[in-house]
Every structure is written in structure tokens, then in C-alpha cells.
Amino acid sequence: MITIVLLILAYLLGSIPSGLWIGQVFFQINLREHGSGNTGTTNTFRILGKKAGMATFVIDFFKGTLATLLPIIFHLQGVSPLIFGLLAVIGHTFPIFAGFKGGKAVATSAGVIFGFAPIFCLYLAIIFFGALYLGSMISLSSVTASIAAVIGVLLFPLFGFILSNYDFLFIAIILALASLIIIRHKDNIARIKNKTENLVPWGLNLTHQDPKK
């Protein structure tokens, strides 16, 4: 019974639409009607500012971490923490508290990985911010980190680097999360190809995007 309750709790944690609620409560703004219409970290930064964007990121990240740690906190045996983390990501993507229309799952997925394999998460953070500096695009960085996650989870155990052995559930979860993130960024990928993707005011913009075109 406790397992079912905690699995539901993991989904409900993921379903907290932090950006949407922050916009509505503190700014009287519905993020779905502004910018990209997304309720995640990037659009929150763009529309509501740095403080709101950072708050959204922190909440979205750590709800994934907390969900992953639920079975450890409650000394639950028999169900991998990754299942709880996956349910949090599903909740974030299809939140019951926001009409099942959620974000792109980047921050929450990162939080899940941090809760299960923190050094692997650090590796992905380095890839993410490296790509962000080179390309000046959150979307490109997210997709690049997703691909790097798949490469890492498949290759690192071969050399005992970061990941000491193969965990086939972790591989499956990484493949699922990476696929979800890339699919959720399909519109961004199209804009990148057309060189019209939105930029952050930092980095080299090596692909010469011009969102004003």
C-alpha cells in the first residue's frame, strides 16, 4: 500500500506547475499566453525575469530529486528510485494540476538523474553549459545534453568512468528521458534549422541564429 501511495505522490510532485503558478500568483500573468507558451524555466526567465526563472528551475529540479529519493526516505524495498523519478517527469510533462499540459521535462529529468547518479548529472551539466556557451540556446543545450546522456550511459561503464557498471533500468530511463526531451523540442529544432531560434544574452551564438528574422 505504501508503495502505491508513494508512486502517486511522485507523480503529484512532478505535477506541480511551478512556472505557471508563480506567474499567476505573483505576476498575474498566464505563461501560456506569452512567449513560447511553455510553463518551464526558459519561458519563465524570458517573461517573468531572473528571480522567477531561477525559482522555477529550482522547484522543477528538486521535485525530480525528491521523487527519486522517496523510496530511500521511507526505506522502501523492491522498487527502483528511478521508477519514482520517471513518474515525476511524467507528472511534469502531463500535470494533473494544469490540464495535463506541462513543460519540456529538462529540469525535472536533471533532478531525477541528480538524485540517482549525481556525478553523471555533473557530467551532463558540464555538457549543457558548454553547449550553451557555444550556441547561446537553451534548446540546443538541452538536446545536446540528452544525446550526451545516452552516449555516456552506454559507454562509461565500459571504462569504469563515472558509471562503474551497466544498470539496464538506468539505461532504459535515460533513453526514455532523452527521447522525451528531444521530441518536446521538435519546434525548437525546426527553428534552429531555420536559424530563428531564441537566444540567451550570453555565449558565442556560433550557429548565427537571428530570432528577429
Swiss-Prot record:
EC numbers, comma separated: 2.3.1.275
MF (Gene Ontology): acyl-phosphate glycerol-3-phosphate acyltransferase activity
InterPro entries: G3P_acylTferase_PlsY
Cellular component annotations (GO), alphabetically ordered: plasma membrane
UniProt entry tagged with the keyword Repeat: no
Pathway(s) served: Lipid metabolism; phospholipid metabolism
Transmembrane segments: 2-22, 52-74, 81-100, 112-132, 143-163, 164-184
Location within or outside the cell: Cell membrane
Reactions that this protein is recorded to catalyse: an acyl phosphate + sn-glycerol 3-phosphate = a 1-acyl-sn-glycero-3-phosphate + phosphate
Topological relation to the membrane, as annotated: Multi-pass membrane protein
Function of the protein: Catalyzes the transfer of an acyl group from acyl-phosphate (acyl-PO(4)) to glycerol-3-phosphate (G3P) to form lysophosphatidic acid (LPA). This enzyme utilizes acyl-phosphate as fatty acyl donor, but not acyl-CoA or acyl-ACP.
Self-association state and partner proteins as the record states: Probably interacts with PlsX.
Entry similarity comment: Belongs to the PlsY family.
Name of the featured protein: Glycerol-3-phosphate acyltransferase
Organism of provenance: Streptococcus pneumoniae (strain CGSP14)
Lineage of the species this protein comes from: Bacteria, Bacillati, Bacillota, Bacilli, Lactobacillales
